[in-house]
Amino acid sequence: MEIAGTYTFNAPPDRVWNILMDPQVISSCIPGCEAFEPLGEDRYKARLNVALAAITGTYEGTVVLADKVSEKSYRLTAEGQGRPGSVKGSAAVSLRPEGDVTVVDVHGTVQAAGPVARVGQRLLAGVSKMMMDRFFACLQGKLTS
């Protein structure tokens, strides 16, 4: 299933890039993140507790940031497993200046297996988009505080 979002930040690309690359900020903004530990350069072990409808559960997995072009783009891949099943996702993230703001575009895919996949693509798509919206809203808050 495909997911996409566009987010506007009241900051220049360098500030937005720096916050997107900061593991402490990332972990504090991922909804339900209980752990986010470095495994090496741009690779992290994560544990999320998701409490939403039929996909409620704890997921453990990895997050990797790759193909980085400073202040312009990167690719994020994540995969995790938990009692409700497994989830794998990948997203292209791009930044572009527009006047005094920076626009971040996200285009990706999410795949699920096991019981979590049986809840239906619409529910999973909605939950994925909601978590992504919360993540970027948190980042915007970090930039303005």
Residue ranges and their predicted role:
Residues 1-43, 47-51, 145:
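Hydrophobic ligand-binding cavity/cleft-lining segments
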Residues 2-6, 43-45, 58-60, 73, ...:
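Intrinsic-disorder/low-complexity, polar/charged segments enriched in Ser/Thr/Lys/Arg/Asp/Glu/Gln
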Residues 5-7, 34, 60-67, 78, ...:
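Hydrophobic/aromatic beta-strand elements that line small-molecule binding cavities or substrate pockets
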Residues 12, 41, 70-71, 98-101:
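Short strand-connecting beta-turns/loops that link adjacent beta-strands
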Residues 16, 26, 65, 106, ...:
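Hydrophobic pocket/interface hotspot
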Residues 37-79, 134:
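Glycine-rich portal/gate segments that line the openings of hydrophobic small-molecule binding cavities
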